[in-house]
Structure formats: C-alpha cells, structure tokens
Amino acid sequence: MANYTAADIKTLREKSGAGMLDVKKALDEADGDAEKALEIIRVKGLKGVAKREGRSASEGLVAVKVTDAHDVAGQVGTMVELNAETDFVAKNATFVGLAERVLDAAVASAARDADALLAADAGGETVAEIVDGAAATLGEKLVLRRVARLDGEHVGVYLHRTSKDLPPQVGVMVATDAAAASVAEEIAMHVAAYSPAYLTREDVPEQLVADERRIAEETARNEGKPEQALTKIVEGRLNGFFKDQVLVDQAFARDPKKTVGQVVAETGGTLTGFARFRVGA
C-alpha cells in the first residue's frame, strides 16, 4: 500500500480540486508521491476535456489590476472574468491562481478581447493552454469569458463579493480625468449596484432611442392620453429610460438628490469611461 497521510490527501485535494476518491487513487498509483499524483490527476483530466465542452460554466470570479500607462500620462485598468462550473472550484486556490496568471497576461499583452488574450503568452504557454491545463487538474470546464481594458488619467476600481466565502463576483472600472479622481471609486461602487448600460445619452444607439420613443408613444395612445399631451408624455418617459440606463443621468447612490453627472461636474472633472462585469451575467 502506498505511503501517504490524511494531510497529503487534504493538500492534494486543495491543489487539484479533485474529489477524495480520485486523489486516493492517484496517490496509490503514484506510490504516495504527491507531485506524480498531481500529474496523474491532470492527465486523466485532459482526457475528459471534450466531455466537459457541453457543460455550463456560470460560476467564477472577476479580477482587476490598475497599472501606470507607458506611452501617456495616466493609468490603465485591466479586468478579466474567468468562469468555472461550480462555486467549489471558483474559490479553489488553483483557480484563483490561474485567474491571477491570466490577468497578468492580459496586462502584459494589452489584449482587449478574449480571443486575443487566449493567444497571448503566459510564461512559455499560451493563456488557452494554461486554462486547459487547469481544467484538466480541476476536472471542470473553465472559460475565459471576457476581458476589458480602460485608459484614463485615473482609473478607479471596485470589486464586490456576493458571498463572503467566494472571490469577487462583480468588478467595475471607472476612468476619469485627474480632476475627478476623488470620486472615481465611489462611482465604481455606484456602477456595481446600478448596472448602467451607457456612459452618456450620445452613447445610446439611435435605433434603440427610436424604439423606446415609439413604444412610449404607442403606450400613451393605448392609455387614451390626449393628443396635445403626447409629446410631453413621450419625452418624459424617454427621460425615464435615460435615467435608468445612462450612467451620468442616474441618481447617485450616495446622494440620490444629485445625478452622477452632477457629482462629477462638481469636481470640475470628466468621466471618460467605465466597464462592469458580473460573473455569469
């Protein structure tokens, strides 16, 4: 019988994310050598990659890093979302470590989409290869879902845990000029809570605005509103849409009497961009 202890089983489970029975079988096969056992788990896991492709990976984490810009004055924010099948794996040290490596590769490569990041170098392997390797070790489908890169004179970030036992599930980056840097983090917290879709009204697609206007008018007519009041009613409802979807028009979470745009204007600065990820959304 292979020579290993309960502590060895516990350590290997934490490293691999594999079940107790699989860990014991691997240790037996490796004659108690933990490193060989980990390799056995990984090899067996690779054989199951194809079987896992059809599974859903809706758990995971969001990771963010802000670095100084090299070519211009200011900062660069980089954010990634990495998905797994279960929250058990999402909080596993191997998975969290993988996310850190993926994030570092995203920063180094300046990738702006998942395909570019998957092809990027991650210490001698591509990001795709280290994700597949971790999937084999952990025995779950892992997916690099998306990456965002945001440039600004200042980039404020906020990470939110939906459960204290899990890594961050919501991540936000907010870019401002230097004058508005003092409110960037508070606005990032606001974005996490209120999930705006657009920065300004000008960013809303014209067709979407036209559709909202048409729906508002049809609804008002169906409600029997007087013809002479339709224009005012439609504009009011369209403004309601903007207040719900546009960041600078939203009531500020910390002081609802002001809009986010007003809070930024009071600093004399400008809000230049934002990105928000929520795991699985």
From Swiss-Prot:
Quote the subcellular location field of this record: Cytoplasm
This entry's Gene Ontology molecular function terms read: translation elongation factor activity
Q: What are the UniProt keywords, alphabetically?
A: Cytoplasm, Elongation factor, Protein biosynthesis
Which SUPFAM superfamilies does this UniProt record tie to the protein?
Elongation factor Ts (EF-Ts), dimerisation domain (SSF54713), UBA-like (SSF46934)
Q: Write out the GO cellular component annotations.
A: cytoplasm
Q: Where is this region: Involved in Mg(2+) ion dislocation from EF-Tu?
A: 86-89
Q: Which family does it belong to?
A: Belongs to the EF-Ts family.
Q: Which HAMAP family does the protein's record reference?
A: EF_Ts
- What is this protein for, i.e. what is its function? Associates with the EF-Tu.GDP complex and induces the exchange of GDP to GTP. It remains bound to the aminoacyl-tRNA.EF-Tu.GTP complex up to the GTP hydrolysis stage on the ribosome.
Q: What name does the UniProt record give this protein?
A: Elongation factor Ts
Organism from which the protein derives: Beutenbergia cavernae (strain ATCC BAA-8 / DSM 12333 / CCUG 43141 / JCM 11478 / NBRC 16432 / NCIMB 13614 / HKI 0122)
**Gene that this sequence comes from:** tsf
